[in-house]
Amino acid sequence: MNKRRANGSSHSTRPVRTGSPKWVRFSREEVEMLIEELAKKGYTPSMIGIVLRDQYGIPLAKPIIGKKVNQFLKDKGLASQIPEDLFNLIRRAVNVRRHLNEYPGDKTAKKGLEEIESKIRRLSRYYKRVEKLPQDWTYDPAKAELLVSASS
């Protein structure tokens, strides 16, 4: 019954491989340097992976550097305080709230905002449980708008 709000299932299947492909020309140090440069430019971990794949021909960073991009950024102190998926939901909620200020009669957008904020609360509860967020962290729309505008 809850199909409307379900996440999509369309995706490609990753090939099963333990090491890095033979045709990748970059060494471990070069890939680490690329990831650091992209992170300092403000790219998110998923965008770093897309840039590495599309512009440099590196299908996955993990077999080359031995860690996931997010873990590498955390070790270097370049990871963000709020997990990327939660931050993207917060950004969506801020955009929908901005839309509702302009068009207050949009009932569909109101329902969408309720669903997004519900998802934010569920995800934040999970991140508190696994200690990726501080226990006193709460979602506040006013603070969320400041957070999103500061990161832009």
From Swiss-Prot:
Signal peptide: none annotated. This is Small ribosomal subunit protein uS15. Part of the 30S ribosomal subunit. One of its GO terms (biological process) is translation. Residues 1-20 are annotated as: Disordered. It comes from the Archaea. The lineage of its organism: Archaea, Thermoproteota, Thermoprotei, Sulfolobales, Sulfolobaceae. Keywords: Ribonucleoprotein, Ribosomal protein. The keyword Ribonucleoprotein applies. It comes from Metallosphaera sedula (strain ATCC 51363 / DSM 5348 / JCM 9185 / NBRC 15509 / TH2). Disulfide bonds: none annotated. Belongs to the universal ribosomal protein uS15 family. One of its GO terms (cellular component) is cytosolic small ribosomal subunit. The gene is rps15. GO terms for molecular function: small ribosomal subunit rRNA binding; structural constituent of ribosome. PANTHER family: RIBOSOMAL PROTEIN S15P/S13E, SMALL RIBOSOMAL SUBUNIT PROTEIN US15. CDD domains: S15_NS1_EPRS_RNA-bind.
